[in-house]
Amino acid sequence: MNKSVSPKYPVALIAGPTASGKSALAIRLAEIADGVVINADASQVYADLRVLSARPDPAEEARAPHRLFGYRDAAEPCSAADWAADAKRAIAAAREAGKLPILVGGTGLYLRTLIFGIAPVPEIDPAIRAEVRALPVEAAHAALAAEDPAMGHLRPQDATRIARALEVIRSTGRSLSHWQAELTGGIGGEIAVAAAIVLPPRDWLRARCDARFEAMLDQGAVEEVKKLRARGLDPMLPAMQAIGVREIAAWQDGLIDRETMVAKAQAATRQYAKRQYTWFRHQPPAAWQRIDTQLNDNEIGKIAIKLRNDALTE
């Protein structure tokens, strides 16, 4: 990799909604730019979710070095701060080896924490955390709306973020929004980001989401959920909340038929992709290029070349 003339070191970033073609673009960029692909997806960190998280398969992983994929056990939650610390080390190692770090994923919170920093929230009282985590999500959402109206905009289904906001207000006496206004620890001032925000046509993306889940069933998703459930893990763990786990579990327990299971998982995937699409359309810096085309092989090749050139001339 050529040395940048900038005092900042180059980092490529490929982000966007699920099923948008990010992984294929990242691997192609790694091949032509001597890069290392670094995962920035909250589900793909878990070893137990290779299929349902749509991790690159072994053949894809063999095409370029991959880091932070499947490196966590499902019993071990991976917070944004945890991941950011690991990502900093992975980026530093890639840089030390003379390779281009390539961040790829759809978890905006992970990327925002790494680049712009994290709220310096004090350690949460363990008793308060246990109390909050024991609440049904509906009760936690109602309590949050009453105790911290500033965070009342969280969706009732967003159990993890609701619990986090509630434990923060109860433990610190201040809203999570207050702490989030005082971000620290980001590496944005140290790196030159060459970014591609992938936002393909919505109809194409929805069809890809539906087809992807059908393919996951053929690739072993049912057995993956069976093995995960056999471990008897806390159902509130992030890995247990991953799209597809609850739907397949309900089918395995005879609560719904297969057709309903597929429809529910596909709908959940589309809804998640819609939220990601909205976030990545508006939240990243305006200077980061948006890609609004379908990522076929030809487009992937052209975008990869542009990203390589952007990264190596920053």
Curated annotation (Swiss-Prot):
PANTHER family: TRNA DIMETHYLALLYLTRANSFERASE
Entry annotated with the keyword tRNA processing: yes
UniProt entry tagged with the keyword Transferase: yes
MF-aspect GO terms: ATP binding; tRNA dimethylallyltransferase activity
Domain of life: Bacteria
Name of the protein: tRNA dimethylallyltransferase
UniProt keyword terms in alphabetical order: ATP-binding, Magnesium, Nucleotide-binding, Transferase, tRNA processing
Leading EC class: transferase
Organism: Rhizorhabdus wittichii (strain DSM 6014 / CCUG 31198 / JCM 15750 / NBRC 105917 / EY 4224 / RW1) (Sphingomonas wittichii)
Catalytic activity, reaction form: adenosine(37) in tRNA + dimethylallyl diphosphate = N(6)-dimethylallyladenosine(37) in tRNA + diphosphate
